[in-house]
Amino acid sequence: MKKAESAQWKIFIGPVEIAGIAGGLVSGFSKLGIYAEANFSYPYPFQSIPVVSHWIFNVWQLLGAARAHTSKSNLVRKVALVLLHNTWGWLIFIRSLPRFNAFFFLGGQTITNSNLELWLLKCLRKKIIFIYTGSDSRPPYIDGGRFPASSSRPSAKYLNTLTKRCKKKLGLHEKFADYLVNSPATAQFHKRHYINWFALGIPKLINSSNFYDKKTQDSVRIVHSPSSSGVKGTSVIIAALDRLRDKGFLIDWINIQGKPNSVVLDELSRCDFVVDQLYSDTPLATFATEAAFFGKPAVVGGYFASDVSSIISADEIPPSLFVLPELIESAIERMILDDSFRFELGQKAKQFVESTWTVELVAGRYLKLLENEIPDHWWRNPKDVSYVGGCGMPLSYAQLLISDLIKKFGVSALQVSDKPELEQAFVSLASEI
């Protein structure tokens, strides 16, 4: 499709921001001469691009903030705000219908979160693309974002309810969406073929030349920036660092939480490397991607480390030191000791993100979805999904949750009976307790 024809796309991106993805896509489409708006139903504290300033969107966010901050203990107020926020979503939807011909939905949410909305979009021939980022599609029983091991263990009944709800929601999306973008690590519930997340990438716009390396100390400077300490395994990482200090290593540990992105980027410019998280299902999540733009390598722990090379093609795997959680200490030690390895890995990561994951390049790949020009190798068959390690929790905790679910409601409660091999893998995992 010619550029002039491509420019006819008017894209809605929202209704939530996840790790700057919406903002990155808006910036990327802008560079391609395509109009896109990021509109959010809740305020996003780390917003890096200007969003549309209009009273109808401002009220939507105010209602969303009030809804989010109201406890369920204040039931009357909570119910009233939920109803008002959802109703206001219909005003946003009605306003958006004539303005956009493509809708990119993040976080597993839509403007009104209703069947009717998706049916209307389909009837009006709007392009619908769902972009999944983790907890919005991952089975709840292997999702540390929902159930960190540090929190109280959910009842099997509640877990069963959430699992059925997640599977049903994805089924609704599959019924109406033109395309589904997901990672093979979180596509266990899909029935339709989906687009491989790693083939598209994370859209990031970082000008590292605006920063400079101010590192002067002799110690090794390591940065960690968890959105949630429990989910990211921060306490285990700190314990590993303490043992390394006992060995005589000089370590300057920078732990950043709840700070503006500008503070994070400044620290990335000053560090030697980053430790992202302990239980990741991707070699390079958003924080590690930001570090890569500065040429700073990442140590990443996760059970997907043992599967990634057999599931993702080599040219799509972003460079990092991606290891099993139990190897996190030795990985950090290697990064401290081997200057050449650290520098080379950082440069490989920088080259990868600058040549593959820039906002313009990633937006260009999403444009191919809009124009139905999709390379065959982007497609993934959900029948091939094999990963059971989850994210954000130790495997031992996932085993407990899976076992609880099976004992109370049977194997079918896993909601993967359409994939017998995957179902058996979950059963085998639970039996190892």
Where are each of the predicted segments found?
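Conserved donor-binding/catalytic core segment of Leloir-type glycosyltransferases
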Residues: F198-K232, I238
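Acceptor-binding helix/loop patch of EC 2.4 sugar-transfer enzymes
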Residues: H54-W55, A68-V76, F130-K164, S310-I312
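Short hydrophobic beta-strand element within catalytic cores of glycosyltransferases
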Residues: P297-F304
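Membrane-proximal helix-turn-helix segments that form the acceptor-binding/catalytic region
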Residues: L91-R99, E117-C123, F147-Y179
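Short N-terminal targeting/anchoring amphipathic segment
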Residues: K10-P15, I92-S114, I129
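Acidic donor-binding loop of glycosyltransferase active sites
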Residues: S269-P283, K296-P297
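C-terminal amphipathic helix plus adjacent low-complexity
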Residues: M1, K350-I433
